[in-house]
Regions:
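Hydrophobic helical h-region of N-terminal Sec-dependent signal peptides
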Residues: 5-10
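N-terminal signal peptide c-region/cleavage motif recognized by signal peptidases
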Residues: 13-15
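N- and C-terminal low-complexity/disordered segments
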Residues: 2-4, 17-118
Length: 118
């Protein structure tokens, strides 16, 4: 039993291997207007912004695993209501888990599809 406990503690002490990531030039997002059912893919350069309905979406950074650029992208987004000026979302969105960190808006959904690598 002591051997198992020591092995478990050793396993916890060894840090997980970090996955190498790269920054992309922008992000591909999908936006949905829940009232009209209209979806639009938004191509946003890093540091740039785009309007969708009453929202203004800004992409600060988009990162992806070097070994697998088509999956597990994550982007830092700021989403503001253009009418009120209120920030609706500010943080990292993860393409593989859109519900993990999502925009909470009664009319619009915005989620990350992938980083723009070309």
């Amino acid at each position: 039993m002591k051997g198992f406990a020591c092995l478990a503690l050793l396993a916890l002490a060894v840090p997980a291997a970090a996955q190498e990531v790269a920054s992309a030039g922008g992000a591909i997002l999908r936006a949905l207007d829940k009232n009209t059912g209209i979806t639009e893919d938004l191509d946003v350069l890093a540091g740039g912004s785009v309007d969708f309905g009453r929202l203004n979406v800004t992409v600060s950074d988009c990162r992806y695993p070097v070994d697998d650029p088509t999956s597990n992208a994550f982007a830092h987004l700021d989403i503001a209501d253009r009418r009120s000026g209120k920030t609706e979302f500010s943080g990292w969105m993860v393409a593989a888990s859109p519900a993990l960190s999502a925009l909470d808006d009664p009319r619009y959904d915005v989620w990350l599809l992938r980083c723009k690598t070309s």
